[in-house]
């Protein structure tokens, strides 16, 4: 993420700000619309402070994770609806949330960006390229490589 952020617009999603309304979907969507031609990155920034102490901490953390996943899934869906042709999604839970939101019935599997991380084309949507990556692994240039392998420039 750090390397990609150096050359592309990026926007941090803050769990506690999403939960308490200090960060809105509309603000995030406006960022996407402004930078959509530059392949913007949305990423979870984590918590800047403990969300809550004590017994409620685990439940609050689950709410925070769910808020991040829902928001990123909605951004992905809306981006595709507005004409985006490629999505690169990192994080196991986030990838799952995005895949469920998009609802594709299957994928044609293409070349691998990294071991176990293929470029996929949804069945019935040959103009769309998707990469789902789980876990904190991969080379520092993963996002650049995935971007180069998706979309018109990635066609062979």
Question: Where are the model-predicted features located?
Answer:
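Active-site catalytic microenvironments in core metabolic enzymes, especially phosphate/sugar-handling
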Residues: 1-156
């Amino acid at each position: 993420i750090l390397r990609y952020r150096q050359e592309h617009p990026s926007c941090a999603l803050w769990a506690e700000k999403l939960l308490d309304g200090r960060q809105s979907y509309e603000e995030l969507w406006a960022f996407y619309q402004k930078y959509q031609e530059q392949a913007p990155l949305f990423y979870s920034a984590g918590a800047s402070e403990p969300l809550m102490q004590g017994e409620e901490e685990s439940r609050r953390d689950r709410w925070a994770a769910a808020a991040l996943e829902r928001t990123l899934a909605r951004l992905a869906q809306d981006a595709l609806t507005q004409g985006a042709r490629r999505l690169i999604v990192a994080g196991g839970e986030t990838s799952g949330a995005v895949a469920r939101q998009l609802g594709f019935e299957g994928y044609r599997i293409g070349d691998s960006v990294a071991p176990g991380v293929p470029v996929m084309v949804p069945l019935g949507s040959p103009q769309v390229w998707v990469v789902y990556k789980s876990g904190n692994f991969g080379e520092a240039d993963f996002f650049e490589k995935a971007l180069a392998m998706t979309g018109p420039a990635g066609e062979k």
